[in-house]
């Protein structure tokens, strides 16, 4: 269905596009998995391996992968953004966390066996299923920390790890070609600081720690440092590269030269571009103490430096915290970016409300939202494939609609839309769950409990030093009181025209990083009733100094889009919660209403009316 068929032609200034930033083709081929596993097992036998590990990772250890690096999906059929597989001689375990436990069952076939992770670790499962033997792994796809942990846990079991070439690459005949996207400059008007200043600061950090150099392998950190962006990974404006930053502030950038021809003048003499296949030799030639990050450094790079006798010090990647602490320019431009995106969302939600559910599909919804966002000249990409999930599909936290799964909206169901844009001046991520017709009381009650979690985080004031894991419970307490919960974190860090998932900060049971001023995180509790419905409400928030109490922090909300008041059980709310919702909707009116079309303004006034 074309965009102009969706009833959006009357929107002021509308343009018409076919979808460009996302597709709806099915990426899962579960029916091919068993035969591919048989081919892998034959190669394993030839190599003398009893098991082989296939992670969801690439040689740069990013969360999101280029098509040629989707080895886990190619082998198993599982298309989630996190997980791994352990292949044995007669079966294979596919390890996924709570976000994907329903999805993995529909995307894999025997002899693949879904395994709940992290409740069951890879080593525990291997020990239970392999009395003794050799486990192979590609040292480019596993970090130093991963292999150290597994080695320690397998000590004394008769099971050993062996690095080897990638076995999937041997049997993946039609593997996609490498990406060749071009890097471009991220202007200082949005970045806030020059790359020379950033390099100078990190060089000082290295000298203070007596590190001669630091090895950088994460694309978002390298792009942030050098004020460049790329298109090597869909929806993530990064380049695939390695870098070494020296204590002088000079940088060796290891990348395919064709990718950076347009940014050479910007990089200047301080950055030396080198062929990516010289990276290992450059590591072996380093002198002095070298900073690495065991949690992200590929084991292959580590082994090369150890063999060369390099003195290594494990510490946090020096770009991680400065990147997470957004500067004033980044925050100011992000605020403007979020206001524009909120207006786009309101235009979309108004349109969605006016549709006949019986004539509207999940793909229609995703196309309609994308095309509204694409009227914004600052939009560069989506920040991820839109989660356009109706009815039972909304119970899959990371559902991706395809032509095979596409369903029509129905009265009496909810519609969950999780989406975002990559703009030159910021990255957005927002989820709204809306009513399609009247809702059962149980659904509205669950929605209200999720909303209470959003409010609890939003209103929080806390002392410096508090970590994300210390406050995660606040987003769950209303759900817990009803015996309900959600199997994902409450929030993740968000980049600035970078990856929509950015560390090190977050709000979850595992997040042990103190929250600091300038850090942007999502606030997105949810509830999922398998086979029936799902609810998630997500705003982005930024940590700031409390104006009232010295030494205390609080959250500033960046996202101003109405929360569906038709889904709220007002009698479940405390007075402070009702006031928060009314104040939030007033802030929506103050910030967004002037940006809306006349038609949407009428809808907007109704949706932001006081409770």
Region roles according to the model:
Residues 3-611:
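Active-site neighborhoods and metal-handling regions in enzymes and metal-associated proteins
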């Amino acid at each position: 269905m074309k965009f102009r068929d969706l009833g959006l032609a009357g929107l002021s200034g509308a343009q018409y596009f076919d979808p460009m930033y996302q597709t709806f083709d099915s990426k899962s081929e579960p029916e091919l998995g068993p035969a591919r596993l048989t081919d892998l097992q034959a190669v394993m036998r030839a190599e003398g391996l009893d098991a082989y590990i296939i992670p969801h990772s690439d040689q740069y250890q990013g969360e999101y992968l280029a098509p040629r690096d989707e080895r886990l999906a190619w082998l198993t059929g599982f298309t989630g953004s996190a997980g791994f597989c352990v292949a044995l001689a007669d079966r294979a375990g596919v390890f996924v966390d709570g976000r994907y436990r329903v999805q993995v069952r529909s995307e894999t076939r025997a002899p693949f066996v879904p395994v709940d992770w992290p409740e069951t670790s890879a080593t525990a499962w291997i020990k239970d299923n392999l009395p003794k033997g050799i486990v192979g792994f590609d040292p480019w796809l596993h970090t130093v920390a991963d292999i150290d942990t597994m080695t320690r846990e397998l000590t004394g079991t008769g099971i050993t790890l062996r690095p080897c070439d990638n076995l999937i690459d041997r049997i993946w005949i039609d593997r996609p070609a490498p990406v060749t996207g071009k890097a471009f400059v991220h202007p200082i008007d949005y970045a806030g600081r020059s790359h020379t200043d950033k390099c100078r600061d990190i060089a000082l950090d290295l000298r203070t720690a007596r590190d001669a150099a630091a090895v950088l392998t994460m694309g978002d950190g390298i792009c942030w440092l050098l004020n460049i962006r790329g298109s090597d990974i869909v929806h993530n404006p990064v380049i695939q590269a390695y870098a070494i930053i020296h204590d002088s502030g000079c940088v060796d950038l290891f990348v395919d030269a064709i990718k950076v021809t347009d940014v050479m003048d910007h990089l200047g003499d301080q950055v030396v571009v080198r062929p990516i296949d010289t990276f290992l030799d450059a590591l072996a030639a380093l002198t002095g103490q070298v900073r690495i990050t065991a949690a992200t450094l590929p084991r292959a790079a580590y082994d090369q430096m150890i063999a060369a006798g390099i003195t290594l010090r494990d510490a946090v990647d020096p770009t991680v915290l400065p990147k997470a602490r957004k500067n004033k320019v980044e925050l100011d431009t992000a605020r403007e970016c979020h206001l524009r995106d909120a207006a786009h969302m309101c235009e979309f939600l108004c349109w969605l409300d006016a549709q006949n559910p019986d004539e509207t599909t999940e793909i229609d919804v995703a196309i309609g939202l994308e095309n509204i966002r694409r009227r914004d000249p600052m939009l560069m990409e989506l920040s991820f494939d839109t989660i356009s999930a109706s009815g039972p599909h909304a119970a899959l936290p990371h559902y991706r609609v395809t032509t095979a799964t596409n369903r029509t909206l129905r009265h009496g169901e909810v519609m969950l839309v999780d989406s975002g844009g990559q703009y030159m001046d910021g990255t957005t991520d927002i989820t709204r769950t809306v009513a399609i017709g009247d809702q059962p009381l149980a659904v509205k009650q669950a929605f209200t409990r999720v909303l209470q979690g959003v409010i609890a985080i939003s209103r929080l004031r806390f002392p410096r030093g508090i970590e994300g894991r210390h406050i995660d419970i606040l987003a769950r307490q209303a759900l817990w009181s009803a015996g309900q919960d959600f199997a994902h974190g409450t929030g993740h860090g968000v980049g600035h025209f970078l990856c929509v998932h950015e560390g090190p900060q977050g709000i979850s049971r595992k997040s042990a990083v103190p929250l600091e001023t300038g850090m942007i995180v999502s606030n997105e509790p949810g509830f999922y009733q398998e086979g029936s419905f799902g609810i998630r409400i997500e705003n982005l928030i930024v940590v700031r100094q409390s104006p009232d109490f010295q030494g205390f922090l609080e959250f500033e909300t960046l996202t101003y889009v109405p929360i569906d008041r038709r889904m709220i059980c007002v009698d479940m709310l405390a007075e402070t919660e009702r006031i928060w919702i009314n104040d939030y909707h007033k802030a929506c009116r103050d910030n967004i209403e002037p940006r809306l079309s006349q038609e949407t303004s009428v809808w907007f006034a109704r949706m932001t009316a006081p409770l």
